[in-house]
Curated annotation (Swiss-Prot):
This is 5'-nucleotidase SurE. It holds the Pfam family SurE. Its cofactor is a divalent metal cation. It comes from Bradyrhizobium diazoefficiens (strain JCM 10833 / BCRC 13528 / IAM 13628 / NBRC 14792 / USDA 110). GO terms for cellular component: cytoplasm. It is found in: Cytoplasm. PANTHER family: 5'-NUCLEOTIDASE SURE (PTHR30457), 5'_3'-NUCLEOTIDASE SURE (PTHR30457:SF12). Nucleotidase that shows phosphatase activity on nucleoside 5'-monophosphates. It catalyses: a ribonucleoside 5'-phosphate + H2O = a ribonucleoside + phosphate. The gene is surE. The keyword Transport does not apply.
Length: 255
């Protein structure tokens, strides 16, 4: 089995080495194509107005001056064009990708691009806490990742579906199990705008997160709840975002 690995944290990110280890537990035919620079939060952006620069950094390891989406396209269509991958793994992201993160995440976008190309694809993310921010518990992803991939691949993944896996911020021995979840929802106040001043007293801004707003009790059955309760969260996400339940009412309103 040929596996293509990517991420959004960049070619030198620790989590990329972890996802490669997970991939090598399944196959010896592993290729890495990742962004030259950190692309966190770029979502599913595609580089149309800038050229892509490709750099070989080692055997079967390539850096692309572009987004995770660009990397998957370059990997599947150019680098591995004569023999495309059988599986795409995106991650392991430093930090969880749950709830509204799904919309912003370059990690999930890398997996979604694999799904668009008709390839089984997983997004993998390792949650961290305030205490473990500088040293996330990567061993949790290493421990549970390979077995989850094997079982899901054996069961088969429907078309236009990407599997979003989030590992809780605890040691492997403290994980209570695995849950299949749905996408959660945070308090609407979780984003903040932080205004600062530069040396010339001109304003500039950072978008950040209000941790207190993110600590609300999440709904049962969600990715947020699973992580809080120390379970691995496995969420099947659909590429098709059509709200079919609203289609009939929408049609009636437009008559």
């Amino acid at each position: 089995m040929r596996i293509l690995c990517t991420n959004d944290d960049g070619i030198h990110a620790p989590g990329l080495k972890v996802v490669e280890e997970i991939a090598r537990a399944l196959s010896d035919d592993v290729w890495v194509v990742a962004p030259e620079l950190d692309q966190s939060g770029v979502s599913h952006s595609l580089s149309l107005n800038d050229p892509l620069r490709l750099r070989e950094v080692g055997p079967r390891h390539f850096a692309v001056r572009g987004t995770p989406t660009d990397c998957v396209i370059m990997g599947a269509r150019h680098i591995l064009g004569t023999k495309p991958p059988d599986l795409v793994l995106s991650g392991v992201n430093k930090g969880r990708n749950v709830a509204e993160d799904v919309v912003y995440s370059g990690t999930i976008a890398g997996a979604l691009e694999g799904t668009i190309l008709g390839l089984p694809s997983f997004a993998l993310s390792q949650e961290f806490s305030v205490e473990t921010r500088e040293r996330p518990p990567w061993d949790t992803a290493r421990t549970f990742g390979p077995d989850i991939l094997r079982k899901v691949m054996a069961a088969g993944i429907p078309k236009e579906t990407v599997i979003n896996v989030n590992f809780p911020s605890c040691a492997p021995e403290d994980v209570l199990g695995i849950r299949v979840t749905r996408q959660g929802k945070r308090n609407l106040g979780f984003l903040r705008i932080d205004e600062r001043r530069d040396g010339r007293n001109n304003p500039y801004f950072w978008i950040g997160f209000e941790r207190a707003a993110m600590m609300d009790t999440p709904a049962e059955g969600t990715d947020l709840a699973a992580l809080r309760e120390r379970y691995v969260s496995v969420t099947p996400l659909r590429l098709d975002r059509t709200n079919e339940a609203f289609s009939e009412a929408l049609g009636a309103a437009l008559k």
